[in-house]
Design a protein with these regions (language model features):
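N-terminal Sec-pathway targeting helices
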Residues: 1-16
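Sec-dependent N-terminal signal peptides of Gram-positive bacterial secreted proteins and lipoproteins
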Residues: 12-26
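Beta-rich carbohydrate-recognition and catalytic domains
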Residues: 25-131, 139-195, 200-244, 249-294, ...
Length: 339
């Protein structure tokens, strides 16, 4: 009797174990992508390709902006997935060129977030003169935003210089609405100029790229935004046209650079160390609908997300600034680069 019960229990346990094994086997058959690999299938995020003109609202009501920088939060931040800083620039009026923040949940329809007071930088001077702000860059690190932007003036302490006095400013925000701690981090240098900065922050180290008036890209770094190393030259393989405005991002062990030249061509390149970049590829910014118009582009911002890329390209078309929004799969983006 005891032997019979043992055999019966053993049989039941065996059936249970067999069922478990079969279930696991069936699950594995679903998740492996071939008999020769144990890597699970990872479904790539679907990319809905888009090419459209969008409106970026401005505090002056003209809705013309330039020099955008976009951030994307997958799960949203303070109610929004997209946070953009840009500068109004109707009629290329530098007095309006003050960093301002707008938000969106779809990357197409932007609004000013509730409670914000744009321009977040304020105005560069009480009265309109040759002093202006420009070239904003925004990042999010741990629990707060940081904003970098440039101030330029032709006259300081009664002394005039033709190319202007240049400073790099810094501000912070916890919620993206209220901004504080406005300070100068880089003072006037007659050669460097600090145009179009890009900043990557890691473990309290600020990595900063900018362009000088000779269209040379430079790299500096700092732990505290008080002391900086001597500028290093950024090199782009087989390229001697000079960099005008640019944006650098870091993702997956690579630095990604999209930059424009003074003759309004847009390029893409990559680097492993942020100093030596590969030979750049030309991004096609010619639009059939703009044939017969007088137009040119400006500093472009981008989002690398999953297997897609999102571009925001300012165009000035017949005297008016417009924003072009383009979403592509990375495969199609790279194919266009190689054509």
């Amino acid at each position: 009797m005891v032997e019979y019960m043992v055999k019966k229990i053993s049989g039941i346990i065996g059936l249970i174990l067999l069922s478990i094994v079969m279930y696991i086997f069936m699950e594995v058959q679903v998740t492996i992508d071939s008999p020769n690999t144990d890597k699970p299938i990872i479904k790539e995020q679907e990319v809905n390709e888009v090419s459209e003109w969008i409106t970026i609202p401005t505090y002056d009501g003209a809705n013309e902006v330039t020099h955008p920088k976009i951030l994307y939060f997958k799960d949203g931040f303070n109610g929004y997935k997209y946070w953009m800083v840009a500068t109004p620039y109707e009629n290329n009026d530098t007095y309006l060129e003050n960093p301002s923040v707008v938000v969106s949940n779809d990357g197409t329809n932007f609004i000013e977030p509730k409670g914000i007071k744009n321009p977040i930088s304020g105005y560069p001077s009480i009265k309109k003169n040759d002093t202006y702000y420009s070239d904003p860059f925004i990042l999010y690190y741990k629990d707060h935003f940081e904003l970098f932007y440039r101030k330029t003036g032709s006259i300081e302490n009664g002394k005039y210089i033709s190319n202007g006095y240049n400073y790099l400013y810094h501000m912070e925000s916890i919620n993206g609405i209220k901004w504080f701690s406005k300070k100068i981090i880089l003072r006037n240098d007659s050669y460097e100029r600090y145009m179009s900065p890009s900043v990557i922050k890691t473990r309290n180290l600020y990595k900063i790229w900018y362009t000088n008036y000779d269209c040379n890209m430079k790299y500096i770094e700092s732990n505290d935004l008080k002391k900086f190393n001597k500028p290093l030259d950024v090199k782009i393989k087989n390229f001697d046209k000079g960099v005008w405005h640019s944006e650098i991002q870091y993702k997956g062990g690579k630095y990604y650079l999209i930059f424009m030249t003074r003759n309004n061509y847009l390029y893409y390149t990559e680097s492993k160390n942020g100093i030596n970049f590969d030979e750049p590829k030309l991004i096609n910014t010619n639009l059939d609908e703009l044939k017969g118009t007088y137009n040119y582009i400006y500093k472009t911002t981008f989002i690398l997300r999953g297997n897609g890329i999102e571009l925001y390209i300012p165009y000035k078309v017949n005297g008016r600034w417009k924003m072009y929004h383009k979403v592509m799969t990375l495969d199609n983006f790279y194919k266009e680069l190689n054509n």
